[in-house]
């Protein structure tokens, strides 16, 4: 729980952070299914927070397992993580990998992905799951949350909702938007 004490104890020089409260909609309540889920690969590391359900998770999981992925949990987040990792290995940047992953997954979801230099928010093409953008005080940074009231915990001002199918990228200097590309979920 992000109490004022917990927030005060966080490193004050940190440039980025991610957190997530997950209730079991799919997968078991185990440490292996805890979020954010951190994945390491040859192009770096990323933390993934996911809200929602994939309707094609069993098929994607089977395909990933047949290609050598070893699952430690039972969540849709792990499926997304392995897809994203595979796509990152063949993509010039994380944004392209997220686009490719979104083309493969079907369902209702919102994602927040953190790398060492970027914070990425993505919303399913139909906008079934909420996701919003907030700006930190004095324009000092950005925040993403599934509920606008969560922005209050970090003192962020609500800017707008992430559009259906949209990917929003925040780095140390700016906030970038991609054009929404809706498709049927």
Language model region names:
Residues 89-96:
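Short, charged, surface-exposed loops that flank catalytic or proteolytic processing sites
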Residues 177-185:
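Single conserved hydrophobic/aromatic residue that forms the stacking wall/gate
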Residues 69-74:
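Conserved glycine-bearing catalytic or ligand-binding loops at nucleotide- and phosphate-handling centers
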Residues 33-59, 98-147, 160, 166-167:
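Conserved catalytic micro-motifs used in adenylation/nucleotidyl-transfer and phosphoryl/amide-
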Residues 1-47:
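Donor-binding/catalytic cores of nucleotide-activated saccharide
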Residues 148-156:
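A conserved acidic, glycine/proline-rich C-terminal tail/linker
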Residues 80:
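Acidic-aromatic/histidine active-site loop/patch
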Residues 83-84:
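Amphipathic alpha-helical
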